[in-house]
């Protein structure tokens, strides 16, 4: 039996949702979804109130997902305009720079509103219209949030690209969504190092197919020298500063696109996950308020980057729609020292802290002292996101960071889901280290076997969701068939998450990790096919296979098996060259942790690579290879086992 940490009665006494309320609200949300979400829609401010709440069919011959379909609203109005009357002087975003020696500063709701309006006007003057796509490739600075909200204000669809991605990854995303304009910065700062953002954009725009980009706006952030190409490149401040501080918001239908965010799939090409305006915004704000038990005076800090969905939902859209104060942190957990997170918590008196298991595991390695030399007395709630948290890391987080007095909300969700789907509510649900516990309102998880049969009781299987929720993605941008095939064809009538899961006797859910060809590295999804195609594009590589393996800090690491073309011999230099080749093609997050030279790969007689075998070798479990008799050349396996890098 897993440890159980009961709800703290003092926390429950003041919580937004109690145990009894959770049970009643969850029941209503499943039995009467139109009634439940119709009431929840009153959280938002509408130009036109919706009368149609839910219109969903997962049937393959009549597939559609629509929420609040006749409603009209604007996301930026909900995040900014409606806060001005009562919260105009309240801090919306609290910027904390990469270096503690640089100045942190608050941005109020009124200041943020004016900055967004100025940029919205500038974008309109540059010819950006409703429905046009704008690529945002910025560091974790306030202008990243400004850019997202300015797009939302004028009805443009933003596509944020994580600042750690390289030129090819930027180009892929620009080409896929036919972006009209890019907003970037001269350079980013991360852990004291400069990231050449503008130079990466320049390199991306030399790649064929990117010529839809008419303008590049460049934020002067570090002041580093960059090449400016007239008339395409313009300094952000030159274009924005003189604009009026009011901007007429576009009236958006509830189902109009709000943003595209690319995520790795099990095939090589990243998927453009499309989220729409009303359902996404409602779900992000509702989950943010309830899961984090939000109060008016909270200082909330989510350490994610806006380049990922966690930054979209739980730094920008959720907190601002709720009138909260959110910390925006440019830095990393271990620069200039490993106390940085805890020093920032004390400096800004952070009350709610939301981070990834990878960061926790990395900081655990340095022991309790760097944590204990800070106070952290302001904290009242901790959260975890991005990957399953192992019980050891959960306990360390609870006991060392939270001094055994702050509940932990271990949240499970995905880019595709828009917001949190399974998580404890700290005033309502007892905690178990390593379990995401119970579903949020309107979320119906089920476990199925390989044939799609629903499994009851305490069991393990593939995690599916039986019905829709407002924050659900609506399509893969430009490829609706891929959306249906990826998520709804495997188990017809339900959404397939791609995750394995176990349910215990108390009905708690324990996510066990991906069951497809996607690796979760530090909470970031990397498609094995993406890394394989990057490796194979090197002139000396004949073939490559990539799998995940358990990693103490990152959760999963990347293990690559590489076969060279005839006449090439493995060397340390070539090893280094291939690792940096992947960094250049995709970005540092995709760098292989292990790269093993392979004389051949284990294949069936039909030529299919047996990844199951490669995974077991990478996991250092050569005794669990199973049946290898169907392989075209079983001797390949012996050689790979003998040369394995995982010991």
Swiss-Prot record:
Positions with a binding annotation for Mg(2+): 536, 538, 541
One Pfam family in the UniProt entry: ACAS_N
GO cellular component: cytosol
SUPFAM superfamilies xref list: Acetyl-CoA synthetase-like
Cofactor(s) for this UniProt protein: Mg(2+)
GO molecular function, one term: ATP binding
Top-rank EC class of the record's enzyme: ligase
Transmembrane segments: none
Reaction catalyzed: acetate + ATP + CoA = acetyl-CoA + AMP + diphosphate
Annotated CoA binding sites: 190-193, 310, 334, 522, 583
Keyword list, A-Z: Acetylation, ATP-binding, Ligase, Magnesium, Metal-binding, Nucleotide-binding
InterPro entries linked: Ac_CoA_lig, ACAS_N, AMP-bd_C, AMP-bd_C_sf, AMP-binding_CS, AMP-dep_synth/lig_dom, ANL_N_sf
PTM comment, free text: Acetylated. Deacetylation by the SIR2-homolog deacetylase activates the enzyme.
GO biological process, one term: acetyl-CoA biosynthetic process from acetate
Entry annotated with the keyword Transferase: no
Record-listed ATP binding positions: 386-388, 410-415, 499, 514, 525
Positions bearing N6-acetyllysine: 608
Top-rank taxon: Bacteria
Similarity field: Belongs to the ATP-dependent AMP-binding enzyme family.
NCBIfam families, A to Z: Ac_CoA_lig_AcsA, PRK00174.1
Physiological role: Catalyzes the conversion of acetate into acetyl-CoA (AcCoA), an essential intermediate at the junction of anabolic and catabolic pathways. AcsA undergoes a two-step reaction. In the first half reaction, AcsA combines acetate with ATP to form acetyl-adenylate (AcAMP) intermediate. In the second half reaction, it can then transfer the acetyl group from AcAMP to the sulfhydryl group of CoA, forming the product AcCoA.
Name recorded for this polypeptide: Acetyl-coenzyme A synthetase
Naturally occurring in which organism (per UniProt): Xanthomonas axonopodis pv. citri (strain 306)
């Amino acid at each position: 039996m897993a440890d159980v940490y009961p709800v703290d009665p003092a926390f429950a006494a003041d919580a937004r949702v109690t145990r009894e309320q959770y049970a009643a609200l969850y029941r209503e949300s499943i039995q009467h979804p139109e009634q439940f979400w119709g009431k929840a829609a009153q959280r938002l401010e509408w130009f036109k109130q919706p009368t149609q709440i839910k219109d969903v069919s997962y049937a393959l011959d009549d597939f559609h997902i629509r929420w609040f379909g006749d409603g009209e609203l604007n996301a930026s109005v909900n995040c900014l305009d409606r806060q001005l009357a009562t919260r105009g002087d309240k801090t919306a975003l609290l910027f904390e720079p990469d270096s503690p020696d640089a100045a942190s500063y608050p941005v109020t709701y009124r200041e943020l509103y004016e900055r967004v309006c100025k940029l919205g006007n500038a974008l309109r003057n540059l010819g950006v219209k409703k429905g046009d796509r704008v690529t945002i490739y910025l560091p974790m600075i306030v202008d990243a949030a400004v850019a997202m909200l300015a797009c939302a204000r004028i009805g443009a669809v933003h596509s944020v690209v994580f600042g750690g991605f390289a030129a090819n990854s930027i180009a892929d995303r620009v080409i896929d969504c036919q972006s009209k304009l890019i907003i970037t910065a001269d350079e980013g700062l991360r852990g004291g190092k400069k990231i050449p953002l503008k130079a990466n954009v320049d390199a991306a725009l030399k790649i064929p197919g990117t010529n839809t980009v008419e303008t590049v706006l460049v934020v002067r952030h570090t002041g580093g020298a960059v090449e400016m190409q007239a008339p395409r490149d313009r300094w952000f401040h030159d274009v924005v500063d003189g604009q009026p501080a009011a901007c007429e918001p576009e009236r958006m239908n509830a189902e109009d696109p709000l943003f595209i965010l690319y995520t790795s799939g099990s095939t090589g090409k990243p998927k453009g996950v499309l989220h729409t305006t009303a359902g996404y915004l409602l779900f992000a704000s509702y989950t943010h308020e309830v899961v984090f038990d939000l109060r008016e005076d909270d200082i909330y800090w989510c350490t994610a980057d806006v380049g990922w969905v966690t930054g979209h939902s739980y730094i920008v859209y959720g907190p601002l729609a709720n009138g909260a104060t959110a910390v925006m942190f440019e830095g990393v957990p271990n620069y200039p020292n490993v106390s940085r997170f805890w020093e920032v918590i004390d400096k800004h008196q952070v009350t709610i802290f939301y981070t990834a298991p990878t960061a926790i595991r990395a900081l655990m390695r340095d022991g309790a002292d760097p944590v204990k030399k800070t106070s952290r007395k302001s904290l009242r709630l901790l959260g975890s996101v991005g990957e399953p948290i192992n019980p050891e890391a959960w306990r360390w987080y609870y006991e060392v960071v939270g001094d055994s007095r702050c509940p932990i909300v271990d949240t499970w969700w995905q880019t595709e889901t828009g917001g949190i789907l399974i998580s404890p509510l700290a005033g309502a649900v007892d905690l178990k280290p390593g379990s995401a516990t119970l579903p949020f309102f309107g979320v119906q998880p089920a476990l199925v076997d390989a044939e799609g049969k629903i499994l009851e009781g305490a069991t393990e299987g593939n995690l599916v969701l039986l019905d829709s929720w407002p924050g659900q993605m609506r399509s893969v941008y430009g490829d609706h068939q891929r959306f249906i095939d990826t998520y709804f064809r495997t188990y017809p009538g339900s959404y397939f998450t791609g995750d394995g899961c176990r349910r215990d006797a108390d009905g708690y859910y324990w996510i066990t990790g991906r069951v497809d060809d996607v690796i979760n590295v530090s909470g970031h999804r990397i498609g094995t096919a993406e890394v394989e195609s990057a490796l194979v594009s090197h002139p000396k590589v004949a073939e490559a296979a990539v799998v995940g393996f358990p990693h103490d800090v990152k959760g999963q690491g990347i293990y690559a098996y590489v076969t060279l073309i005839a006449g090439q011999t493995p060397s340390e230099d070539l090893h280094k060259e291939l690792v940096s080749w992947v960094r250049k093609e995709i970005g540092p997050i995709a760098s292989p942790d292990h790269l093993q030279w392979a004389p051949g790969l284990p294949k069936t007689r039909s030529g299919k690579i047996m990844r199951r075998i490669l995974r077991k070798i990478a996991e250092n479990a050569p005794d669990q290879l199973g049946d290898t008799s169907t392989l075209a050349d079983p001797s390949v396996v012996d050689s790979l086992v003998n040369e394995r890098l995982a010991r």
